[in-house]
């Protein structure tokens, strides 16, 4: 038997067309800045000043901007600093966040709800509003212009990851804990051998959110890391800005250089990323 074609009303057809046109339009809008950045990165300074931003460069093999951006902005050192900060912050955030989530989720004690509400309240506060107090604390502790101080500060402001772990842990049966306790396992062993492996999807989600935020952080890095040898990738791009104008061809080249490591990580770990985010979202 021949299958009947599904009949659509005029309103449904209009709605389908509208959805796809909107999807194409907003995708195009999102891609334009990236295309413009790539085009500008290959232009000479004279080309950039005399042509439209979407005008193609005369020479696609002009890598002078990339070399100059890498050398003048000391992007090699900046990349190392960014990686050190990001890796340390992610490790600290995972250890602190998962342990705190385990305690708040599995143990009922006076003040449990209050602590959760305080974390929620802290998440709602804009980070800029707390910078005066945070800066004073950082200054008094001698953490200004020290990578370890900046790392500690960034680890201490990770509230969203804690809530991701708590919400995911809500779906892990308590019976697993009870069975492990009957078998003689300690709370630490339950956390290390049971909870942490089961939290892998949530950890992937938290690492992506936190990692992108730390790698792209400009305000805090510029405030607490003012020495030249401590600059991160986000700060190094502002080497080409000044009161008399900005060298956007070099800035765009620097942007592409800074994006390459993230792109490589995404390509290598895309399977884990695609499997981790949906699982973390569903469980959360």
Question: Residues of each region from the PLM?
Answer:
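N-terminal Lys/Arg-rich, disordered targeting/topogenic segments
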Residues: 1-5
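A structural signal for multi-pass alpha-helical bundles of membrane permease subunits
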Residues: 6-11, 15-284
């Amino acid at each position: 038997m021949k299958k009947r074609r599904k009949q659509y009303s005029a309103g449904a057809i209009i709605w389908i067309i509208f959805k796809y046109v909107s999807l194409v339009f907003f995708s195009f809008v999102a891609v334009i800045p990236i295309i413009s950045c790539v085009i500008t990165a290959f232009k000479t300074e004279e080309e950039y000043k005399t042509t439209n931003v979407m005008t193609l460069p005369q020479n696609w093999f002009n890598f002078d901007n990339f070399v100059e951006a890498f050398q003048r902005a000391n992007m090699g050192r900046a990349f190392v600093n960014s990686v050190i900060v990001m890796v340390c912050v992610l490790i600290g955030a995972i250890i602190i966040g998962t342990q705190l989530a385990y305690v708040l989720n599995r143990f009922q004690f006076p003040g449990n709800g209050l602590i959760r509400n305080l974390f929620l309240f802290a998440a709602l506060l804009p980070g800029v509003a707390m910078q005066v107090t945070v800066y004073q604390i950082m200054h008094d502790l001698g953490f200004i212009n020290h990578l370890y101080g900046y790392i500690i500060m960034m680890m201490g402001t990770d509230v969203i990851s804690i809530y991701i772990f708590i919400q995911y842990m809500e779906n892990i049966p308590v019976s697993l804990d009870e069975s492990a306790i009957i078998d003689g396992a300690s709370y630490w062993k339950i956390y290390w051998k049971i909870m942490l492996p089961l939290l892998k999807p949530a950890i992937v989600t938290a690492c992506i959110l936190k990692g992108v935020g730390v790698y792209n952080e400009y305000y805090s890095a510029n405030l607490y890391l003012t020495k030249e040898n401590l600059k991160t990738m986000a700060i190094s791009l502002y080497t080409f800005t000044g009161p008399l104008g900005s060298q956007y061809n070099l800035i765009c080249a620097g942007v592409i250089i800074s994006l390459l490591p993230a792109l490589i990580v995404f390509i290598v770990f895309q399977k884990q990323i695609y499997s981790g985010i949906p699982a973390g979202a569903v469980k959360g």
